[in-house]
């Protein structure tokens, strides 16, 4: 009798992707975060669907509809906090996933890497439009400030901003379209994630040693399904602790106040996971320059495959580049910290130094260290 999972047209796809997939035998827990991102996406879509059943995308009722969800809907408070903190868990997993890709040289699989960058940008867009929906003070002013950055584009900037707003300021039209975007984008992310997996399975996964493991692969199931399951349980534990014990720790207190266009918050800032890019934006005195630096802070990830000249795969045997890599990680933490501080001395200066260091590390220091290490190998 033929094995159904190997012959059925639909089950065959699942089988080749999650059951009989040849996998390197030595991939560590850092490889768990891809599956965790899939779980985060599913949690966000499901909780978001239930929130959308009770939310109203109207400026007069949006804030009170969120309060209604928390107070009157059965377990509405739990769904809302799982969704809000689920976004934070999503970005934690995303940053670790990208960091692992840089450390172990996964960017050599260029199609997978580039689809990943598109996924990163789409996720950031989804999170941004979602942050506007509760219509609190920081939601409103965050939307105003960030969308207004498009006015820096020469000639078409002003028209483009009004086109996105649907009027002359952030108002009802803006909220309605942001809700529509926030609803559709996760499904686009899901489609891109499948393409991401498709390209990954064309080449096979990388591994910590950076060596070819074709001769020594093992089936994905049961070895890595059980490993992923443990990761998922730990992720759910962390998410439940966050949502049940510290639900507002990552939020902004200003969002407990309904949006008021006549009253500006003392310090406008986005969610914590955008602070590194926000610092880079603020560090450049010129508006257009700041916007370009903001975009480049993410798109610079596409430079990794182009700037890679190393004869070794990954950083496991490369101590010089390892040091530079961890400097980059600390630098990103500094950028995140500065983004949450007011625009005054010494924070502005620290932010400018950290922004310059961020780009210098990736564009200059890493390629130079590659060349030095290549020459050391020849000795």
Swiss-Prot record:
Organism: Akodon aerosus
Cofactor, how bound (note): Binds 2 heme b groups non-covalently.
Binding site for heme b b562: 83, 182
Chain positions recorded as a ubiquinone binding sites: 201
UniProt keyword Heme present: yes
Membrane topology (UniProt): Multi-pass membrane protein
Residues passing through the membrane, by range: 33-53, 77-98, 113-133, 178-198, 226-246, 288-308, 320-340, 347-367
Taxon lineage: Eukaryota, Metazoa, Chordata, Craniata, Vertebrata
Full protein name: Cytochrome b
């Amino acid at each position: 009798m033929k094995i159904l999972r190997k012959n059925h047209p639909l089950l065959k796809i699942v089988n080749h992707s999650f059951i009989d997939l040849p996998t390197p035998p030595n991939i560590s827990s850092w490889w768990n975060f891809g599956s965790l991102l899939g779980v985060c996406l599913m949690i966000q879509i499901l909780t978001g669907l239930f929130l959308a059943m009770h939310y109203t995308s109207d400026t007069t009722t949006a804030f009170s509809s969120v309060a209604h969800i928390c107070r009157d809907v059965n377990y509405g408070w739990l769904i809302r906090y799982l969704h809000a903190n689920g976004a934070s868990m999503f970005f934690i997993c995303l940053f670790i996933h990208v960091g692992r890709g840089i450390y172990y040289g996964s960017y050599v699989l260029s199609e997978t890497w580039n689809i990943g960058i598109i996924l990163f940008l789409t996720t950031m867009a989804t999170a941004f439009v979602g942050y506007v929906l509760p219509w609190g003070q920081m939601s409103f002013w965050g939307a105003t400030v960030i969308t207004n950055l498009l006015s820096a584009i020469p000639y078409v900037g002003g028209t483009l901003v009004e086109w996105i707003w649907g009027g002359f300021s952030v108002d009802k039209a803006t909220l309605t379209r942001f809700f529509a975007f926030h609803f559709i984008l996760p499904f686009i992310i899901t489609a891109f994630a499948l393409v991401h997996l498709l390209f990954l399975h064309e080449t096979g996964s990388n591994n910590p040693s950076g060596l070819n493991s074709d001769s020594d692969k093992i089936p994905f199931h049961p070895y890595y399904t059980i490993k992923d399951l443990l990761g998922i349980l730990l992720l759910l534990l962390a998410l439940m602790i966050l949502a049940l014990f510290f639900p507002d720790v990552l939020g902004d207190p200003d969002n407990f106040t309904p949006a008021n266009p006549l009253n500006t918050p003392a310090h406008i800032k986005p969610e914590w996971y955008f602070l590194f890019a926000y610092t880079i934006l603020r560090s450049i005195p010129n508006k257009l320059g700041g916007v370009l630096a903001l975009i480049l802070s993410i798109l610079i990830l596409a430079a990794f495959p182009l700037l890679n000249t190393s004869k070794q795969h990954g950083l496991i045997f490369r101590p010089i580049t390892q040091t530079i890599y961890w400097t980059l990680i600390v630098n990103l933490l500094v950028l995140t910290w500065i983004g949450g501080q007011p625009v005054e001395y010494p924070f502005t200066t620290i932010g400018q130094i950290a922004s310059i260091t961020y780009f210098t590390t990736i564009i200059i220091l890493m390629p130079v260290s590659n060349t030095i290490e290549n020459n050391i190998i020849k000795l």
